[in-house]
Amino acid sequence: MSKSTKKLYKENWSFSDIPDLTNKIMIVTGSNRGLGFFVAREIVIKGAHVIMAVRNIDEGEKSKDIILTDNPNAKIDVIKLDLADLHSITTFTNEFKEKFSRLDVLLNNAGITAGIKLTPHTPTVDGFEYFFGVNHLGTFALTGQLFDILKQTPNSRIVTVSSLSHKQGSINFDDLMSEKKYSNMRIYAQSKLANLLFGYELSRHIAQQKLNIKSVLVHPGFAISSKKKQGFWINLGKNY
């Protein structure tokens, strides 16, 4: 492992480092599988009340049942959320606010990876390019609609999962929806760069307004999620 790669890892970190989260209300988007599922599983062990925000309710309920098998007293709600549909985002936030009066952590985990093979120019429900629409615009809209309840909750936190792939990206304002030139990797990198810029600007706004919120950006490291099973690295490995 190279020195630069080693910097991406904290080798002695474990789930035991997660602090007590008793009674914390936490939304984890895309938590029916992959990284989001494992985050949800571990934070309920620490006492958090987790809202699994998922596109597929049936899959979400199955994942909830798996968690409850080992943690029967876990507090978990499953609510439908499709980041490719602005109406779904509004419906989700309205339902959440009807049930809860606080939000301690919003974990923006859900997204589309570069390994997913989409038909070029696949649109979201609202007509946006799919990668940019889900990874950035959907996350932006969700965070904005929950910002009022986050402001009301002391020491709340917004965690947005980005990627080091942002270094390969640029924001092409002349072709934001990639109508002229299409490349999965380029569009994915653009969406992750947009996540990064959004997180930075959100942090600046929070500091300027002197709000008791933190905006945190994370690169999850190298992980084999269910989405990456369809991706380049897994397919490459199958050939050897």
Predicted regions, residues:
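Rossmann-fold NAD(P)H-dependent dehydrogenase/reductase core
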Residues: S4-G237
